[in-house]
Amino acid sequence: MAKSNEESSNLNVMNKPPLKKTKTLPSLNLRVSVTPPNPNDNNGIGGTSTTKTDFSEQQWNYPSFLGIGSTSRKRRQPPPPPSKPPVNLIPPHPRPLSVNDHNKTTSSLLPQPSSSSITKQQQQHSTSSPIFYLLVICCIILVPYSAYLQYKLAKLKDMKLQLCGQIDFCSRNGKTSIQEEVDDDDNADSRTIALYIVLFTLILPFVLYKYLDYLPQIINFLRRTESNKEDVPLKKRVAYMVDVFFSIYPYAKLLALLCATLFLIAFGGLALYAVTGGSMAEALWHSWTYVADAGNHAETEGTGQRIVSVSISAGGMLIFAMMLGLVSDAISEKVDSLRKGKSEVIERNHVLILGWSDKLGSLLKQLAIANKSVGGGVIVVLAEKEKEEMEMDIAKLEFDFMGTSVICRSGSPLILADLKKVSVSKARAIIVLAADENADQSDARALRVVLSLAGVKEGLRGHVVVEMSDLDNEPLVKLVGGELIETVVAHDVIGRLMIQCALQPGLAQIWEDILGFENAEFYIKRWPELDDLLFKDILISFPDAIPCGVKVAADGGKIVINPDDNYVLRDGDEVLVIAEDDDTYAPGPLPEVRKGYFPRIRDPPKYPEKILFCGWRRDIDDMIMVLEAFLAPGSELWMFNEVPEKERERKLAAGELDVFGLENIKLVHREGNAVIRRHLESLPLETFDSILILADESVEDSVAHSDSRSLATLLLIRDIQSRRLPYRDTKSTSLRLSGFSHNSWIREMQQASDKSIIISEILDSRTRNLVSVSRISDYVLSNELVSMALAMVAEDKQINRVLEELFAEEGNEMCIKPAEFYLFDQEELCFYDIMIRGRTRKEIVIGYRLANQERAIINPSEKSVPRKWSLDDVFVVLASGE
């Protein structure tokens, strides 16, 4: 029976499927199924074993603190049914699993994550990383605090035991001792808190420096918002804000130093309070003394107190070093500001010069001479140069300014702030110098400066004198500036003076005397005592001046030069005179003069002349028109330069010059280089009456280069002329001198060494002095004459109308006349007598040059003293051009 039961049990076992041994891995939450070996398989003797495992489709769940997020679980699916029913055999006892087998089985059961799951895990890791840093920061903060709470709890327990044990003592001695102990305990607690605050303050900068960039991520995580990956890191943003703060606010450095000092005092006081037994007020005071004086910590006792005091003293030394650096920088910056000319000029009635050029030296000289009579003045120069450089250039002039102060400021005349810095609204005169560049750019800059001056809100008290480079740009500047603008066209002034000096040798020296303030110059003034007098009487009413014209009040202030003798001076009229200074002349009683008998000689007729232009100027068309008005018919103008003939015709036509409409002169074109000898030798240099060496347009931007070419041309022409002696066509010379038979001065100028009159245009006044001393040229015209004209117009804007008329080809002009027109040889006359005789020719005699003197005398003194005159003398007159 028992045997049958055993067999039936064996049959039941054989009919059942193979048992699965299940082993659970608690750490990985996995379930491993191990199937016993099948007896039908060949494993060793009986066959091989087959292992089957059942897994669910869920993802492996890692703890959240490891960085990989968990997914929701899915229901476990039952294993699929086997394809074949197992053979009902009694399996052998399975071999127990070893440790190695267990590891192999476990590793084989771990699923390999796909690429998408890896990316998802990385994103989850990057998202949870701020939490990790937040936990770290919280741990750093909470661990000391928890230790402090534990310490305080222990203290409270001890206090409780002490209080319970000393109740009898407290009842006998009162509550005073208990209160003191409680206060001591409170102080100990506060010192502990102070110590933790100090430690936390020391650790906080390092933590912020390390993890400051993660703070926005933590904030975004707490707010449940997505972070912007393109945001600038917080560390860079803070550095940028600090940089902007120090750049914008001028007192940022001082404020930062003050905050650092207060922080060091407060931090040091807190640290001292934590390590000493004193009060908080005493700790703060000691902290201040350590900051102010590093030697105060020498007497401290105790290790903690010494460490804290030394640290505070070191910080104090650093702060005081920073303070000294800031003070030194502030002083240096202020000194540099003063040295560089950035401070404001507080002046009134000064002359303001805008710009910088080679004319500035002679301009300052003339203005200083003009201010000599009033004890000096103030001249302010505003230019786009360093103040030190300007002052060095002015010091090189080696000129005595005679009490006049020259103040230089660095800035741009185009900026209103710089104009206000030099008190532009309070200046009595403003001079705008042309820039050292081509004419169009220079005039365009002058126009912008005039617009800037017109934009001054306070208005302008004085007038503006603008130096122009091109005559065509003058109307535009006057249109923009209005009545306050007076223009001086430098190129045009020199060109017209060159023509006048070429036709009348010696006239340049006279113009130099009249335009400069060293001798006689023009003045306009009202004299009420001269009202109702005829002009012929006014002419001899000034012992120390020579009247030249009248400013007619009834005609809108028009200046009439050389008026009619019968003109009666009316109320409001002013008299134009030539005098040494504005305070050196006054009307006096009428002197006794005698007209007498004198020769009535008419002006000789004009004869054709031959003139050579070497070089090409921008305004050469204007010079040709002036020559057309001055020269006699049949004259020739030779033009020798490198500009092709067709290009010349085009430029002359652009200047509105009708070449075929010229009646008095004939243009002869020659192409060549004026600094090459063989080109000059092709010209009949010995046949010209006058040779004008012009500053060439191609090199006008460089003063030194232009002067070098002019000097080379001058020397070559003189050498060629000397080699061609004794041949000379004297026709033109004899024709010119026929009307001046006794004029030894003109003969001396023209026939010296049998050479033509050469007028050179030298731009630099220093080069001009060298040429004048060497006497290789009859006369040299330079920018110094333009500077004189600018200074004269700056002193009185009305003089500009006088100069414009005298420089023009029409109207009154300055001439040199021989003595035979006014007297007989060795006749004894005073200067007043000669002035009266000159009125019969509608001329105003303003000076003379004696035969034995080199320079002419304008506005001579002692006009009523008679003297003997020679026919070799010449007189300087203002004559009508009719």
Swiss-Prot record:
Region (Disordered): 1-122
Membrane topology: Multi-pass membrane protein
Family to which the UniProt record says this protein belongs: Belongs to the castor/pollux (TC 1.A.1.23) family.
Phenotype of gene-disrupted mutants: Loss of microbial symbioses. Undergoes typical root hairs growth deformation in response to Nod factors, but exhibits no calcium spiking and nodule formation.
Biological process terms in GO annotation: monoatomic ion transmembrane transport
Keyword Lipoprotein: no
Name this polypeptide is given: Ion channel DMI1
Highest taxon of the lineage: Eukaryota
Biased amino acid composition, Low complexity: 107-117
Assembly and binders: Interacts (via c-terminus) with CNGC15A, CNGC15B and CNGC15C (via N-terminus). The Nod factor has no effect on these interactions, implying that the complex is maintained after activation.
GO cellular component: nuclear membrane
Species per Swiss-Prot/TrEMBL record: Medicago truncatula
Induction field: Not induced after bacterial or Nod factor treatment.
Tissue specificity as recorded in UniProt: Mainly expressed in roots and nodules. Also detected in pods, flowers, leaves, and stems.
Sorted UniProt keywords: Coiled coil, Ion channel, Ion transport, Membrane, Nucleus, Transmembrane, Transmembrane helix, Transport
Keyword Ion transport in record: yes
Coiled-coil regions listed in the entry: 378-403
Biased composition (Polar residues): 48-62
Domain note: The N-terminal domain (1-76) is sufficient, but not required, to target DMI1 to the nucleus.
Pro residues compositional bias, start-end: 78-95
Subcellular localization(s) per the UniProt record: Nucleus membrane
One family name in Pfam for this protein: Castor_Poll_mid
PANTHER family recorded: ION CHANNEL POLLUX-RELATED (PTHR31563:SF10)
Location (main, coarse): nucleus
Role description: Required for early signal transduction events leading to endosymbiosis. Acts early in a signal transduction chain leading from the perception of Nod factor to the activation of calcium spiking. Also involved in mycorrhizal symbiosis. May be involved in the regulation of the calcium channel responsible for calcium spiking by mobilizing another cation, and thereby altering the membrane potential.
TM segment ranges: 129-149, 192-212, 255-275, 307-327
